[in-house]
């Protein structure tokens, strides 16, 4: 006959993968810890000893793990061996128990005596040494029941039970599920128990009595006889007093407490296994409550605890429920929805589910708090897909992963560095709430960012300085949100200039400043100048050699530009600091106070420093509103296609250099040239050449040039061609140019050209041409000059009194005045008045002398003499003639002809 199989042991088994992972995590953690502490160990021998101890322990653990993996290949044999050992221990316990039972039986048989009146049995014992039959003294003989009687009785009992249960009003809802068979009613409560009850008589209101009881959970073994007897007595008493409701309450409490005992047994076994040192538990039997505290290594005396209370919490609702307190705060059922104590009583699964929820809660709270702290820079923190880890960017190249060990509750930060390990210790030693964890991680971000910038800057030639600013200075310049300040400088800079890096409270991006400081008497520093440097950066920016080199270039230029910026502020000239593509500062000036209308209101000033020195020149760039084609030179450059002009100012770093004065001088010079060019274009004249020194244009057939004031020639000068008839009034034109500008000069040249051309012609005709007279005189001797003195006197002299008033002197005859009058801006408003000016009367003749003839007066003024040529529109005024500019020459020629008659 084949025996039954050996029972299989399933308790205290751990997955091989989980065990291997735990060994690897512990080895990594110990190795990281010893590597972190090695720099603080002074002796090399001690360092080697500490490292060797860690390696030996790790090797022992990995050897054990290797043995386990070898066993895993023959897992069936090993499992069978474990089952055999467990079965042998069980058999030994059985024999031990049998021995104890036999001893107890021998002790109890002393009271097992036959009654004295049973003489028959006594005689048998006396004669034969033992009774030959069971005694039936005073006993009525039993009648055997027929099977038909038994079946009929059972059917009757079934009918009576059906009727009685149908009429019963005190059946609890949990007993609505029942079946009737074999003369008994069986009530089943799912995942709890089954109970059989029967009736003692055939009355419809007779009481029920307890028959049998079975548990529907655990190993479903028979209850011990003592427990069963106690339960039967209590059940019959409850049925007799209060019916089925009392029976349900009694049996349900018993089943639930029995289940709690089995649950507590699991907890005790778990405390000896993988969860050792992480659980604290207690069973309150009088309250039907198990208090299970997890992550006890994280719970100091002053910190709130995380507990699971498993038990019966209501007499009206008899069931096992779970109440979860997470770090001292009860978690509502709607959040966790834990179903435990019914179908599932696996405490390991319950703990795994709860710790997973707790882990997700911590991760979610830390994530929310970090996003609130980071503000717009929330891309630095992200959740992993499973929600069990949080990735946090510390710098552009470094990040860490925040999570919690579900077994111990300790915080773990991956990608370890010295700062990250320090933060991990702080999280495990000091932190009790997720908001504190977020603050520690946020501080780690700030420290990592500051340390990254400091390390890279020092590696690229910068020096970090310990500068102490007062609290008021910090608040004034950096605000209340600045957490860390780093002072950097270059060795070649002046000692009081620094680049300041501030890390704001939100930890998003560092702010860069250029600062000029001075030391106060109390050794604290104060800022004379603190300007923001706008760096094109984002979360992916690298604070590498390229960026820091660009910062050196920008800051060096900015330091040299500082006196110029102070001058602009003092002159109340609006400006903005920009940054060029070559990473140098660019000053954008509002030049509305420097120029009027010819240029746009913005000027860009680009500094250029010589390599290896502090010498600097300034390139000023602007744009004219109208495109000009002006020639360029060493100090100014014009782009005829775009209208952009560029100025170069030398010696910007020399003492006494004034940017405002230099700009005013250069821009006014350009403005004057531009105004002249626009004037010439407006007047419809032809521009011949234009430069920064001179502008030349055509006026009729003649060319007129104007010298522009400059540093070498501070005066504006008008130049006429040698044959220009206006040379006679050049001094008056120059005076008008100095006082009123070029427009009235051009107007005079245009308006009076007919007049002075005619005057030049008349002068040549009457022998008043200076060149012709000079030629004649040069060919005569002194005696001829005396003889021809009267003959050589000019018959016409032109005497200009101003640019608009000229007198024609006819010696011995008369004077003619020509006056230009402008009544309005229209062409009709310009008139020439030609009139006869009275001569001075000769003195009265001396006695004996003939009387002097009185000069005659022309008769042309009153219109009595008709012109023999077309003089155009002329108005006779009795004492003169008014005519237009186009006809003034013809009128003068006609008047001259009348004078010559």
From Swiss-Prot:
Principal subcellular localisation of the protein: nucleus
Keywords: Activator, Nucleus, Transcription, Transcription regulation
GO MF terms, alphabetically ordered: transcription coregulator activity
Record keyword Transcription present: yes
GO cellular component term, pick one: mediator complex
Localization per Swiss-Prot or TrEMBL: Nucleus
GO biological process: regulation of transcription by RNA polymerase II
Domain of life where this protein originates: Eukaryota
Residues annotated as signal peptide: none
The keyword Flavoprotein is assigned to this record: no
Pfam families in the cross-refs: Med14
Record note on quaternary structure: Component of the Mediator complex.
Annotated function: Component of the Mediator complex, a coactivator involved in the regulated transcription of nearly all RNA polymerase II-dependent genes. Mediator functions as a bridge to convey information from gene-specific regulatory proteins to the basal RNA polymerase II transcription machinery. Mediator is recruited to promoters by direct interactions with regulatory proteins and serves as a scaffold for the assembly of a functional preinitiation complex with RNA polymerase II and the general transcription factors.
Family: Belongs to the Mediator complex subunit 14 family.
Protein name from the UniProt record: Mediator of RNA polymerase II transcription subunit 14
């Amino acid at each position: 006959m084949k025996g039954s199989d050996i029972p299989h042991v399933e308790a205290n088994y751990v997955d091989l993968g989980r065990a291997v992972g735990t060994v690897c995590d512990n080895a990594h953690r110990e190795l990281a810890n010893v590597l972190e502490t090695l720099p603080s160990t002074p002796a090399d021998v001690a360092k080697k000893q500490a490292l060797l101890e860690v390696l030996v322990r790790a090797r022992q653990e990995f050897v054990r793990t290797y043995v386990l993996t070898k066993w895993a290949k023959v897992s069936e044999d090993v499992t069978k061996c474990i089952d055999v050992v467990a079965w042998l221990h069980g058999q030994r316990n059985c024999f031990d128990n049998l021995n104890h039972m036999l001893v107890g039986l021998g002790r109890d048989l002393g009271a097992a005596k036959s009654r004295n009146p049973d003489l028959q049995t006594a005689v048998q014992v006396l004669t034969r040494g033992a009774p030959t039959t069971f005694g039936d003294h005073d006993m009525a003989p039993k009648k055997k029941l027929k099977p038909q009687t038994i079946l009929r009785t059972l059917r009757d009992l079934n009918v009576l039970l059906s009727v009685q249960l149908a009429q019963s009003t005190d059946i609890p809802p949990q007993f609505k599920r029942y079946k009737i068979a074999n003369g008994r009613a069986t009530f089943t409560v799912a995942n709890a128990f089954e109970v059989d009850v029967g009736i003692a008589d055939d009355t419809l209101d007779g009481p029920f009595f307890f028959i049998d009881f079975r548990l529907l959970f655990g190993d479903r073994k028979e209850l011990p006889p003592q427990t069963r007897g106690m339960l039967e007595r209590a059940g019959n008493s409850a049925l007799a007093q209060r019916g089925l409701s009392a029976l349900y309450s009694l049996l349900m409490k018993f089943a639930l407490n029995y289940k709690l005992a089995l649950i507590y047994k699991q907890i005790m076994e778990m405390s000896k296994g993988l969860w050792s040192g992480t659980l604290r538990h207690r069973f309150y039997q009088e309250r039907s409550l198990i208090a299970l505290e997890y992550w006890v290594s994280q719970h100091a005396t002053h910190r709130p605890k995380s507990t699971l209370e498993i038990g019966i919490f209501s007499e009206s609702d008899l069931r096992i429920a779970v109440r979860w307190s997470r770090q001292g705060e009860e978690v509502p059922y709607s959040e966790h929805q834990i179903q435990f104590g019914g179908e599932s009583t696996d405490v390991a699964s319950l703990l795994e589910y709860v710790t997973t929820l707790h882990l997700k809660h911590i991760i979610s709270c830390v994530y929310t708090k970090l996003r609130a702290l980071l503000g717009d820079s929330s891309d630095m923190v992200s959740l992993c897909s499973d929600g069990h880890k949080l990735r946090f960017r510390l710098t552009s190249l470094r990040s860490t992963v925040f999570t919690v060990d579900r077994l111990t509750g300790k915080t773990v930060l991956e990608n370890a560095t010295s700062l990250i390990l320090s933060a991990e210790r702080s999280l495990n030693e000091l932190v009790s709430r997720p908001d504190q964890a977020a603050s520690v991680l946020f501080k780690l971000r700030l420290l990592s960012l500051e340390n990254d910038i400091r390390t890279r800057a020092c590696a690229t030639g910068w020096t970090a300085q310990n500068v102490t600013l007062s609290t008021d200075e910090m608040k004034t310049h950096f605000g209340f949100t600045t957490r860390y300040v780093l002072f950097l400088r270059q060795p070649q800079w002046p000692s009081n200039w620094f680049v300041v890096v501030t890390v704001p409270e939100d930890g998003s991006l560092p702010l860069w400043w250029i600062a000029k400081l001075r030391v106060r008497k109390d050794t604290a520093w104060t800022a004379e100048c603190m300007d923001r440097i706008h760096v094109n950066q984002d979360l992916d920016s690298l604070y590498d050699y390229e960026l820091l080199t660009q910062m050196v270039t920008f800051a060096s230029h900015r330091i040299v530009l500082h006196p110029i910026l102070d001058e602009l502020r003092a002159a109340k000239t609006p400006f903005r600091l920009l940054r060029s593509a070559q990473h140098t500062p660019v000053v954008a000036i509002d030049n509305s106070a420097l120029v009027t209308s010819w240029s746009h209101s913005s000027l860009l000033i680009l500094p250029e420093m010589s390599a290896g020195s502090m010498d600097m020149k300034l390139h000023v760039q602007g744009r004219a509103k109208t495109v000009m084609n002006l020639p360029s030179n060493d100090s100014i450059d014009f782009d005829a296609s775009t209208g952009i002009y560029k100025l170069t100012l030398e010696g910007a770093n020399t003492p006494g250099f004034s940017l405002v004065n230099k700009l005013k001088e250069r821009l006014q010079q350009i403005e004057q040239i531009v105004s002249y060019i626009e004037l010439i274009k407006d007047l419809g004249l032809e521009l011949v050449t234009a430069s920064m020194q001179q502008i030349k244009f055509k006026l009729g057939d003649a060319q007129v040039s104007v010298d522009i004031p400059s540093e070498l020639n501070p005066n504006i000068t008008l130049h006429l061609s040698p044959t220009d008839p206006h040379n006679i009034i050049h001094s008056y034109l120059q005076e008008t140019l100095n006082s009123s500008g070029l427009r009235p000069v051009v107007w005079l040249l245009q308006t009076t050209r007919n007049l002075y051309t005619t005057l030049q012609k008349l002068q040549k005709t009457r022998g008043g041409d200076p060149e012709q007279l000079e030629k004649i005189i040069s060919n005569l001797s002194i005696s001829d000059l005396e003889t021809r003195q009267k003959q050589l006197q000019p018959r016409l002299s032109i005497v200009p009194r101003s640019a608009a008033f000229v007198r024609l002197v006819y010696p011995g005859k008369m004077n003619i005045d020509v006056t230009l009058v402008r009544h309005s801006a229209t062409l009709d408003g310009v008139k020439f008045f030609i009139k006869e000016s009275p001569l001075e009367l000769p003195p009265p003749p001396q006695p004996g002398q003939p009387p002097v003839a009185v000069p005659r007066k022309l008769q042309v003024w009153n219109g009595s003499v008709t012109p023999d040529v077309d003089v155009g529109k002329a108005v006779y005024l009795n004492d003169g003639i008014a005519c237009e500019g186009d006809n003034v020459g013809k009128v003068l020629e006609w008047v001259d002809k009348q004078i010559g008659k």
